[in-house]
Amino acid sequence: CGRGSSGHAAAEMEMRFMRIGVDIDSLLDNDLIRMRTIFQTKESLVFGISISGETEDVLYLLRESHKRGAKTVLITAKYDDTLYEFCTEVVQIPSLQHLNQGHVISPQFPILLILDIIYSSYNELDRQTKESLHHNTLQALADGWAKTGKKEKNHDY
C-alpha cells in the first residue's frame, strides 16, 4: 500500500507480481488501507511504501497487520529504529532533498528500483513456472483482443 507516488509504485508492484501468480492487492485509498487490516493473518506478507516514513494510513496498516501476526515490510527513506516495533523488515531507499515533491527526480525511482530487485529475486525461484504464467497472461490478453476485434495494445506487461 501507499499514497501518492508510493501508491503508484504499489500498483506497479501488483501488476508485475500478479502476472506470475502472486495473489496481491495494491491499496491506494485511505479507507481501503484501513479496512484491509482486518483481513491480515500470520500467513500474510504486507508491504507498505512511504518515502517519508510518516504516512499514517500506511503505518496503521503495518502496525495492525503486525498485531495480527502478519510479516510486515516498510519501504522508506526514513531511518528510525522504532519502525522495527511493528515492521519485520525496513528497506531503506536513498532520498534526495525534496525527492517527495518530484521536482527533479521522480519520487518513484528509488522505490521502483527496490521493487525490481525484489521482483527479480522472487522470479528466480521456480523461474520456469513463473515464465509460463507470465506467457499465459499475455496469451489471455491476446485472446481477449482477438475476440473483440481490437488490435493488440502496446503495453509493457
Which sequence ranges carry the predicted segments?
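A short, charged, Gly/Pro-tolerant segment at domain boundaries
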Residues: Q128-Y157
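Glycine-rich phosphate-binding loops that contact phosphosugars or nucleotide phosphates
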Residues: C1-L113, Y119-R127
